[in-house]
């Protein structure tokens, strides 16, 4: 394929990669062309990266809490979408509440799935509402679900943490 000057394009994997063993996987991005590039310095592939495969954690996290999102004085929920590749049972949601979150804030975890046929968002389950103690702020905690949720292969889930309290800060990494 040819890309004309000033145009952009995207590259996609034709064969998906599924890790087969527990460990760290390193991803290096490279590009090769059969023509001379006039300005190779403007080719952007993004940084190389690595990810870990573990027995029990599926996370979107770089391991360094370096910011937060908050709700000001409003109720809110924040989370991520997760594609599930094998049937799994989930028992809790890990989260970190940033410094400045008021002690006593009421928080919870909730999980929805995207119906693969209709595209509707369907409630699946949640944790009990807890009141945050001082020792639960600026540290990773697990919000245990009221009962385990069986996640289905091939389904996308929206895993979120929410609050009924003002000024709650959910760490970002």
Which residue stretches match the model-derived regions?
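Intrinsically disordered, low-complexity Pro/Gly/Ser/Thr-rich segments with frequent PxxP/GP/PP motifs
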Residues: 1-22
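Short proline/glycine- and polar residue-rich coil/turn motifs
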Residues: 2-9, 130-139
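Beta-strand-connecting loops/turns
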Residues: 6, 22-23, 138, 152-154
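Coil residues (strongly favoring Ser/Thr
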Residues: 10, 35, 53-54, 116, ...
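Terminal connector regions
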Residues: 18-51
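Beta-sheet-rich sandwich/jelly-roll-like modules and their strand-loop junctions
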Residues: 42-117, 151-156, 162-173
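Short Trp-Ser/Thr-centered turn/loop motifs at beta-strand boundaries
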Residues: 125-127
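Short, surface-exposed tryptophan/glycine-enriched loops
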Residues: 141-155
């Amino acid at each position: 394929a040819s890309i004309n000057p000033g145009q952009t394009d995207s590259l996609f994997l034709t064969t998906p990669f599924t890790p087969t063993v527990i460990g760290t996987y390193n991803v290096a991005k490279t590009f090769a062309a059969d023509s001379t590039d006039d300005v190779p310095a403007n080719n952007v592939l993004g940084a190389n990266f690595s990810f870990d495969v573990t027995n029990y954690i599926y996370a979107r996290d770089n391991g360094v809490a370096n910011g937060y999102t908050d709700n000001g004085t409003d109720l809110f929920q924040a989370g991520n979408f997760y594609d599930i590749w094998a049937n799994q049972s989930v028992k809790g949601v890990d989260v970190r509440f940033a410094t400045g979150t008021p002690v006593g804030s009421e928080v919870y975890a909730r999980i929805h799935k995207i119906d693969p046929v209709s595209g509707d968002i369907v409630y699946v389950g949640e944790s009990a509402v807890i009141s945050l103690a001082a020792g639960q702020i600026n540290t990773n905690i697990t919000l245990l679900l009221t009962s385990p949720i069986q996640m289905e292969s091939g389904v996308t889930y929206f895993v979120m943490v929410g609050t009924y309290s003002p000024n709650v800060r959910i760490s970002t990494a």
